[in-house]
Amino acid sequence: MVRDLSLNGTILQFLEWVDSPPLVIPTQNQSKPMQIFKEFSFEAAHRLPNVPPDHQCSRLHGHSFKVRITVEGEAGIESGWVMDFSELGRAFRPLLDQLDHYYLNDIEGLENPTSENLAKWIWLRLQPNLPSLYEIEIRETCNSGCRYHGD
């Protein structure tokens, strides 16, 4: 329905929706979850022991790995954020220190360091202290990687 409103002698028109629900501004409990992420990079060498001997990944080689850690939650009313990005960085730092410039095959749990196994390895170590963890993304090249959402 269109109604007229007079403001200082000027007629303004506005729409009034019949039978429309009132506008509700979400509170913290009513807002939808959001996902935020932080990206990290590290250099490491590895080889894949379970591929045929003539496969290129059977030989020692290195990557500039990219890791994207995503958490999910509701933005706080006071803070306006899901999580402080620096807090996310602090949570991942101990794992990053174990990976950067190391031979991944020598790390316990990464004897077969595929991107998939690396994502799961990170998840299992990060999730107990980061319950809002949503996804781990690993990129071992510009166009190859995996995403993991936990067990």
What is each of the regions a protein language model found here?
Residues 6-8, 52:
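Generic hydrophobic-segment detector
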Residues 25-151:
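Charge-rich, low-complexity N-terminal segments
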